[in-house]
């Protein structure tokens, strides 16, 4: 999820796609043709690349957040070493297939929703500047989460399994089992409320922080921090290492604010897989249980250091790939 928020934030922070004078294939019409489809592909590719890069860390995060009995006594680095020993190196990528299926529609919905909300907030509500980016980002993130949440539930269930103790044999089997045993469609939306509450500040702060850093950087030091886009020299984009820095700062701040909701969401998503299932039926019960059993640092913020470790490489890949894809698909 973080990777896609970052990718969309990059698009948000930049000016609307410039439309040069007609010149062969680069004219106004060609730049407008299938714009949303090209945006969809750019965001999807960037998200998949970023998520695959940090998939091992995502798997470890799920195991630590939910206190899997095989790994609950270990730290981040110890778990990264223990998973390949117990499950093989592919065990670090368990659940990543479901994530790839989710990440494409997530990116498409988020990007299109962001553009729609941004326009609506600016034209109808008269709000502009960084505030409208904060509002539009929050709304777009929540919209994308609601639409793709069932896939995230399945991914988490698959990631939580360890070798020799499989409840689900694959993505399809997980969908069928959850639907049959956990209340039909409602079973796919366990933990949705803390997810939405966590996504609103996460997406909003990500858009706001990155957009502000980029705007300030390109305004005050364009020659040092920026370069012309390869598909449209009239548009300045951040240099790769500056993208990494700004994205890392935005991701770290947003993650710190929203992390307790992320922990709560994961536990609720796991549902009947956990022995303390009946104590974690609602968001309030889950947060109370985690806090009572493990406290703040080892409970509500358990695994946060892993998220910080994930943040820099994830944002780096997301921003770099998305920049390349935007230029490749003539989106600037």
From Swiss-Prot:
Domain of life per record: Eukaryota
Gene Ontology annotations for the cellular component aspect, listed alphabetically: mitochondrial inner membrane; mitochondrion
For membrane topology, the record states: Multi-pass membrane protein
Q: Name one GO molecular function term.
A: secondary active transmembrane transporter activity
Q: Which GO terms describe its biological process?
A: coenzyme A biosynthetic process
Q: Where in the cell is it found?
A: Mitochondrion inner membrane
The entry's protein name is: Solute carrier family 25 member 16
Q: Which residues cross the membrane?
A: 37-57, 88-108, 134-154, 191-211, 244-264, 299-319
**Which keywords does UniProt give here?**
Membrane, Mitochondrion, Mitochondrion inner membrane, Repeat, Transmembrane, Transmembrane helix, Transport
Do you know which PANTHER family this protein is assigned to? SOLUTE CARRIER FAMILY 25 (PTHR24089)
Describe where the Solcar repeats fall, as residue ranges on this chain: 34-120, 128-216, 238-328
| Entries under PROSITE patterns matching the protein | SOLCAR
Family of this protein: Belongs to the mitochondrial carrier (TC 2.A.29) family.
Pfam families cross-referenced by the UniProt entry: Mito_carr
Query: Which purpose does this protein serve, as stated in its record?
Result: May be involved in the transport of coenzyme A in the mitochondrial matrix. Very little is known about the physiological function of this carrier.
């Amino acid at each position: 999820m973080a990777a896609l928020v970052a990718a969309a934030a990059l698009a948000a922070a930049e000016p609307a796609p410039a439309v040069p004078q007609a010149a062969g294939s680069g004219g106004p019409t060609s730049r407008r043709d299938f714009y949303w489809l090209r945006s969809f592909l750019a965001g999807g590719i960037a998200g998949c690349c970023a998520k695959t890069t940090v998939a091992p860390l995502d798997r470890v995060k799920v195991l630590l957040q939910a206190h899997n009995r095989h790994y609950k006594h270990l730290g981040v680095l110890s778990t990264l070493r223990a998973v390949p020993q117990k499950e093989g190196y592919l065990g670090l990528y368990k659940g990543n297939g479901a994530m790839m299926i989710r990440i494409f529609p997530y990116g498409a919905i988020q990007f299109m929703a962001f553009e729609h909300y941004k326009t609506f907030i600016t034209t109808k509500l008269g709000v502009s500047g960084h505030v409208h980016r904060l509002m539009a980002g929050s709304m777009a993130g929540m919209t994308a989460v609601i639409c793709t949440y069932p896939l995230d539930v399945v991914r988490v269930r698959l990631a939580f399994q360890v070798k020799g103790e499989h409840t689900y044999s694959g993505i399809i089997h997980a969908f069928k089992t959850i639907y049959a045993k956990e209340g039909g469609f409602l079973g796919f939306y366990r933990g949705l409320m803390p997810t939405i509450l966590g996504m609103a500040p996460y997406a909003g702060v990500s858009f706001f922080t990155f957009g502000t850093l980029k705007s300030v950087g390109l305004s005050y030091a364009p020659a040092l921090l920026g370069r012309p886009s390869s598909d449209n020299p009239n548009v300045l984009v951040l240099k790769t290492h500056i993208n990494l820095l700004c994205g890392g700062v935005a991701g770290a701040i947003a993650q710190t604010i929203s992390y307790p909701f992320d922990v709560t969401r994961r536990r609720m998503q796991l549902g009947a897989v956990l022995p303390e299932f009946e104590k974690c039926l609602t968001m309030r019960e889950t947060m109370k249980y985690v806090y009572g059993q493990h406290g703040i640092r080892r409970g509500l913020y358990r695994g946060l250091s892993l998220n910080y470790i994930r943040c820099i490489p994830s944002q780096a890949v997301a921003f770099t790939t998305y920049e390349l894809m935007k230029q490749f698909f003539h989106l600037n």
